[in-house]
């Protein structure tokens, strides 16, 4: 059987993996077998948390909007605001509403008051 000269293929592969794990602590950045395990684990976490980040930010935006909106009226809440926005066909997503709530509360108060006034007028006309 003839000799096969592979050069430095294995070293190159291990070097690439160790560069990925160079910021890990202890054996996770030194031992090849644990590096590969930690690399798989890190990539799984990154993949999972990309989806989770979207959920977390949506929850944060909803919390911010709700906190500001509850200051408007006793019986007014986030769900009523979103319902009224949909009825009026206003295209403001939760991210924009949260930015308005943080930076300029008066603007959000004005939006919610206008929506509520028009909603109250329609309801009073329907009762008559």
From Swiss-Prot:
CDD domains: Ribosomal_L20. GO terms for biological process: ribosomal large subunit assembly; translation. It is found in: Plastid, Chloroplast. GO terms for cellular component: chloroplast; ribonucleoprotein complex; ribosome. Keywords: Chloroplast, Plastid, Ribonucleoprotein, Ribosomal protein, RNA-binding, rRNA-binding. GO terms for molecular function: rRNA binding; structural constituent of ribosome. Gene3D superfamilies: 6.10.160.10, Ribosomal protein L20. It holds the Pfam family Ribosomal_L20. It comes from the Eukaryota. The keyword Ribonucleoprotein applies. Binds directly to 23S ribosomal RNA and is necessary for the in vitro assembly process of the 50S ribosomal subunit. It is not involved in the protein synthesizing functions of that subunit. Belongs to the bacterial ribosomal protein bL20 family. PANTHER family: 39S RIBOSOMAL PROTEIN L20. This is Large ribosomal subunit protein bL20c.
């Amino acid at each position: 059987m003839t000799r096969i000269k592979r050069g430095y293929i294995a070293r190159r592969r291990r070097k690439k993996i160790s560069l990925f794990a160079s910021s890990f602590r202890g054996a996770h950045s030194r031992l090849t077998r644990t590096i590969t395990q930690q690399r798989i684990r890190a990539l799984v976490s990154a993949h999972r948390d990309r989806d989770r980040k979207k959920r977390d930010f949506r929850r944060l935006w909803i919390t911010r909007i709700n906190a500001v909106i509850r200051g408007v009226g006793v019986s007014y809440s986030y769900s009523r605001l979103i319902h009224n926005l949909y009825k009026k066909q206003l295209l403001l997503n939760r991210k924009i509403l949260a930015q308005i709530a943080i930076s300029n509360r008066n603007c959000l108060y004005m939006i919610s008051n206008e929506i509520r006034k028009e909603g109250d007028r329609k309801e009073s006309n329907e009762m008559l």
